[in-house]
Amino acid sequence: MIEIPDITIAVDGCSSTGKSSFAKEVAKKFNFLYLDSGALYRGVTLFAQENAYIDAGNVVSDDLETALEALDLHFGEGGVCCMGDRCIEAEIRSMGVSSQVSPIAAVPYVRNWVDERLHFLAASGRVVMDGRDIGTSVFPNAELKIYMTARDEVRAQRRFDEMKAKGGNPVFEEVLANLRERDYIDSHRSTSPLRKAEDAFELDNSDMTMAEELSWVQGLIQGRFGLLG
């Protein structure tokens, strides 16, 4: 394994491009701390749903801002997302949460809360994190930025398979429609819209295995930082 300096690696991209899986494997391979910003947004969404801070029409209550002050979201053993002492990893990946995470993530004070949480968790340095605006907004000075993309149908199939594996009963057409709707909302919101940072390296993993993705990023790191394998 190559030794790399204590840097911040930002991984951005559309939903279901495999950002989390990729970032987790990069963290494992290079002994980095992994932070999943998307899980925090999903955790806030679940919290809002359970406490009636968002309705069926995706209208977010102003009371959520004050309620966030007492919300404890963190990552437990294995990188699972927890709300207090409760593991919510499976719940935040449900279709119900997926359908409302974009409206929640578009709220400026929610984005500020997540950003502050990420900076707190990343204070020790040597981290890799994934999301929609890590390299453009949260950590614009990250030493390495990667923007992940894949074909719509490939991304929808990944999400469909993930939901099936967790005991869900998804409909592929609904998953695909939800994915495209989220893409539109994420890229058109007024606060920190989804976009590729000018200095980000693009990774289209539509037809790549994880081993191929890791080989790609290792070559990128070696070339960018002048390291020998």
Model regions and ranges:
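Hydrophobic positions on the alpha1 helix immediately C-terminal to the Walker A/P-loop
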Residues: F22
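Small-molecule kinase domains that catalyze NTP-dependent phosphoryl transfer to phosphate-bearing small molecules
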Residues: A67, L118-S124, R132-S137, N141, ...
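P-loop (Walker A) phosphate-binding loop of NTP-binding proteins
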Residues: C14
